[in-house]
A protein has these predicted regions:
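Single conserved hydrophobic/aromatic residue that forms the stacking wall/gate
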Residues: 1-12
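FAD-site-proximal beta/loop scaffold in flavoenzymes
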Residues: 8, 118-187, 197-198
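Residues forming the flavin
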Residues: 9, 18, 25-36, 40-41, ...
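Short hydrophobic beta-strand segments
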Residues: 13-24, 54
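Residues at the starts of beta-strands that form the adenosine-phosphate
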Residues: 14, 49-53, 166
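A Rossmann-like FAD-binding core segment of flavoenzymes
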Residues: 38, 42-149, 204
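Internal hydrophobic alpha-helix adjacent to the cofactor/substrate pocket in enzyme cavities
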Residues: 39, 185-211
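C-terminal auxiliary extensions adjacent to catalytic cores
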Residues: 226-274
Length: 274
């Protein structure tokens, strides 16, 4: 992402950041780049020349109540408009325009209002789904919110397939109601492994995953809002952050994000140590 362009004296004046209507890898990613762009422009002294707009298909900015108030405050403090219930329908790159639909419900009536926004810089989050082979193999959900995108139909606690008891699924492709992040996968791996071994031995899978996920939302260069939560959308804070008020952005969480998580992933998780 060329943030140096967003904060430069070049022809970038209107920047648009979008979030989509499907589950996707790291739900906080569109928020991070938006806030980092704003802070970078301030650091370069060009913030007064830049208009940022955030568009999301969701009905709220963030669906974890413990962290939402502060996140809303940050957007308001930085004068970044939040546009809810809006879907991207197309992008005209030659005209530098995004075609949106505003979706509203009045009673039982669904009202769809199309509109167009001009941009100089666009950060677009596309809709995401499971690979076609998952859908074609009949492994995905066939009903409910996760069916349209064919995420694998597993029990949210044991991670065992609802129909095929010899299949265990985890990570981005698993159809479970939590965020698709490496932090979530880190907690899912031992659950999935132990339950798979139990199945291979003809035993019942007893290990249970509580939906833990973490989304370190980078709010500026030096601070992170460390969102850790479970299936109930309640805080599930790890040590040592359990001794700190994590409803606010933290410098210590920035250190974790920048200097610890990457080596933990590549040297620890990928080698089975973390």
């Amino acid at each position: 992402i060329p943030l140096r362009l967003v904060g430069s004296e070049m022809c970038i004046r209107d920047s648009i950041y979008t979030d989509t209507y499907t589950k996707h890898k790291c739900g906080g990613a569109p928020k991070k780049i938006c806030l980092l762009s704003e802070h970078y422009a301030r650091k370069q002294g060009t913030r007064d020349k830049l208009q940022l707009n955030y568009f999301t298909a969701s009905k709220e900015l963030y669906d974890i109540p413990y962290f939402t108030p502060r996140l809303l405050e940050i957007y308001n403090e930085r004068n970044i408009p939040i546009n809810l219930n809006v879907r991207v329908k197309g992008v005209d790159t030659s005209a530098k325009q995004v075609h949106f639909e505003k979706i509203e419900t009045k009673g039982e009536e669904k009202i769809v209002t199309p509109f167009v926004e001009d941009y100089d810089f666009l950060h677009f989050t596309p809709p995401m789904s499971a690979p076609d082979f998952v859908r074609d193999a009949g492994l995905g959900w066939t009903e409910g919110k996760l069916a349209a995108d064919a995420w694998v139909m597993v029990d949210k606690e044991t991670l065992v397939h609802k129909k095929y008891q010899n299949i265990v699924s985890l990570g981005d492709v698993a159809g479970i109601p939590t965020s698709k992040t490496s932090a979530a996968i880190r907690k899912q791996v031992p659950i999935a492994a132990k339950n798979l071994i139990a199945l291979m031995e003809g035993k019942e899978p007893t290990e249970k995953y509580n939906g833990y996920a973490a989304c370190p939302i980078v709010t500026d260069y030096g601070h992170v809002l460390l969102c850790e939560f479970d299936y109930e959308k309640k805080p599930d804070v790890s040590f040592p952050f359990s001794m700190i008020d994590t409803s606010k952005e933290l410098w210590l969480a920035w250190i974790l994000k920048v200097y610890i998580l990457k080596p933990m992933y590549f040297n620890g998780m990928l080698n089975g140590y973390a």
